[in-house]
Amino acid sequence: MTNMRKSHPLIKIINHSFIDLPAPSNISAWWNFGSLLGVCLTLQIITGLFLAMHYTADTTTAFSSVTHICRDVNYGWLIRYTXANGASMFFILLYFHIGRGIYYGSYTFMETWNIGVLLLLLVMATAFMGYVLPWGQMSFWGATVITNLLSAIPYIGFTLVEWIWGGFSVDKATLTRFFALHFILPFIITATAAIHLLFLHETGSNNPSGLNSDSDKIPFHPYYTIKDILGLLIMLMVLLTLILFSPDLLGDPDNYTPANPLNTPPHIKPEWYFLFAYAILRSIPNKLGGVLALAFSIVILALFPALHMSKQRSMSFRPMSQCLLWALVANLIILTWIGGQPVEHPFIMIGQLASISYFCIILILMPTTSLMENKMLKW
């Protein structure tokens, strides 16, 4: 009699994905982030579901309902802060996951990579709409500023903005639709992540050497299940430390003031994980130019397969490219810092220089360095 896990139509899928999956024997801890993102997404859906049971998507009661969740619902504060800080954790893991993909040349799996870029955009949209829901000052003004960017689109811009708002300003209709979309998007993300995994399993995982590992595979379970559980415990420890000791560390104090359309906060800024893109947006004096730079700063990830000029897949044996990648990481940290600063000297200049160098590193320096490394190795 065959093992049920190998014959049952449903269990067979799980078996081929997480148990008997042949995995390279040399993948490092950098390959843990995919499973951690899956856990994070599950956590977000569960906490979000419980929050939705108590939240009201109405401008007059939204802020009070969040207060009610924190004060009156059993462990409501825990659920609320897990959903808020879980989003931050999600982005930390996501940025590590993307960085790993760039370092080890995983973007050469075109379908997997492009679906990954789509996933990033979906997660960003979900996080943005979630930030609007508590209906604090930063929620309201963040929604106003970011949706208003679409008015830079020629001809249809203003119509599009009013269509998204459901009126002539960010109001009840906007909040209701943002809540509906914020609820449905994580399920769309789950389905997209399943497709992401499907395409990955067509080719098998990449590995630190960037070489074909078909001749040296080991079963996913128990080797990588145990390894992933270690990563999971570390992640949960970091997340719980954040939630239980400083839940508002990554938030904005302005969001504890109910939304007031008549009073603009002194510094409107998004959550920390969008600050790098926000800095690029602000560094260009022209509105349409800024919006295009903002969009391109994220969509540029889709160009990585086309910009890969090296004869080697991974950066493991390419020290010059490694230096450039770390320069890019430092550059993104500078952009994140600048995004949270007021628009004044010297921050404007630093932001503009960091924005230029961001695009230069990716579009010019990295491909050129790859070609140079090929030459040095006489390839």
UniProtKB/Swiss-Prot annotation:
<feature type="transmembrane region" description="Helical">
    <location>
        <begin position="178"/>
        <end position="198"/>
    </location>
</feature>
<dbReference type="InterPro" id="IPR048259">
    <property type="entry name" value="Cytochrome_b_N_euk/bac"/>
</dbReference>
<keyword id="KW-0479">Metal-binding</keyword>
<keyword id="KW-0679">Respiratory chain</keyword>
<keyword id="KW-0249">Electron transport</keyword>
<keyword id="KW-0472">Membrane</keyword>
<dbReference type="GO" id="GO:0005743">
    <property type="term" value="C:mitochondrial inner membrane"/>
</dbReference>
<dbReference type="InterPro" id="IPR048260">
    <property type="entry name" value="Cytochrome_b_C_euk/bac"/>
</dbReference>
<feature type="transmembrane region" description="Helical">
    <location>
        <begin position="347"/>
        <end position="367"/>
    </location>
</feature>
<dbReference type="GO" id="GO:0045275">
    <property type="term" value="C:respiratory chain complex III"/>
</dbReference>
<keyword id="KW-1133">Transmembrane helix</keyword>
<comment type="function">
    <text>Component of the ubiquinol-cytochrome c reductase complex (complex III or cytochrome b-c1 complex) that is part of the mitochondrial respiratory chain. The b-c1 complex mediates electron transfer from ubiquinol to cytochrome c. Contributes to the generation of a proton gradient across the mitochondrial membrane that is then used for ATP synthesis.</text>
</comment>
<dbReference type="Pfam" id="PF00032">
    <property type="entry name" value="Cytochrom_B_C"/>
</dbReference>
<feature type="binding site" description="axial binding residue">
    <location>
        <position position="97"/>
    </location>
    <ligand>
        <name>heme b b566</name>
    </ligand>
</feature>
<dbReference type="InterPro" id="IPR036150">
    <property type="entry name" value="Cyt_b/b6_C_sf"/>
</dbReference>
<keyword id="KW-0999">Mitochondrion inner membrane</keyword>
<dbReference type="InterPro" id="IPR005797">
    <property type="entry name" value="Cyt_b/b6_N"/>
</dbReference>
<keyword id="KW-0813">Transport</keyword>
<keyword id="KW-0830">Ubiquinone</keyword>
<feature type="transmembrane region" description="Helical">
    <location>
        <begin position="33"/>
        <end position="53"/>
    </location>
</feature>
<dbReference type="GO" id="GO:0046872">
    <property type="term" value="F:metal ion binding"/>
</dbReference>
<dbReference type="InterPro" id="IPR016174">
    <property type="entry name" value="Di-haem_cyt_TM"/>
</dbReference>
<feature type="binding site">
    <location>
        <position position="201"/>
    </location>
    <ligand>
        <name>a ubiquinone</name>
    </ligand>
</feature>
<feature type="transmembrane region" description="Helical">
    <location>
        <begin position="320"/>
        <end position="340"/>
    </location>
</feature>
<dbReference type="GO" id="GO:0006122">
    <property type="term" value="P:mitochondrial electron transport, ubiquinol to cytochrome c"/>
</dbReference>
<feature type="transmembrane region" description="Helical">
    <location>
        <begin position="226"/>
        <end position="246"/>
    </location>
</feature>
<keyword id="KW-0408">Iron</keyword>
<comment type="subunit">
    <text>The cytochrome bc1 complex contains 11 subunits: 3 respiratory subunits (MT-CYB, CYC1 and UQCRFS1), 2 core proteins (UQCRC1 and UQCRC2) and 6 low-molecular weight proteins (UQCRH/QCR6, UQCRB/QCR7, UQCRQ/QCR8, UQCR10/QCR9, UQCR11/QCR10 and a cleavage product of UQCRFS1). This cytochrome bc1 complex then forms a dimer.</text>
</comment>
<dbReference type="InterPro" id="IPR005798">
    <property type="entry name" value="Cyt_b/b6_C"/>
</dbReference>
<protein>
    <recommendedName>
        <fullName>Cytochrome b</fullName>
    </recommendedName>
</protein>
<feature type="binding site" description="axial binding residue">
    <location>
        <position position="196"/>
    </location>
    <ligand>
        <name>heme b b566</name>
    </ligand>
</feature>
<dbReference type="InterPro" id="IPR030689">
    <property type="entry name" value="Cytochrome_b"/>
</dbReference>
<feature type="transmembrane region" description="Helical">
    <location>
        <begin position="113"/>
        <end position="133"/>
    </location>
</feature>
<keyword id="KW-0812">Transmembrane</keyword>
<dbReference type="InterPro" id="IPR027387">
    <property type="entry name" value="Cytb/b6-like_sf"/>
</dbReference>
<dbReference type="GO" id="GO:0008121">
    <property type="term" value="F:ubiquinol-cytochrome-c reductase activity"/>
</dbReference>
<dbReference type="Pfam" id="PF00033">
    <property type="entry name" value="Cytochrome_B"/>
</dbReference>
<feature type="transmembrane region" description="Helical">
    <location>
        <begin position="288"/>
        <end position="308"/>
    </location>
</feature>
<feature type="transmembrane region" description="Helical">
    <location>
        <begin position="77"/>
        <end position="98"/>
    </location>
</feature>
<keyword id="KW-0496">Mitochondrion</keyword>
<feature type="binding site" description="axial binding residue">
    <location>
        <position position="182"/>
    </location>
    <ligand>
        <name>heme b b562</name>
    </ligand>
</feature>
<feature type="binding site" description="axial binding residue">
    <location>
        <position position="83"/>
    </location>
    <ligand>
        <name>heme b b562</name>
    </ligand>
</feature>
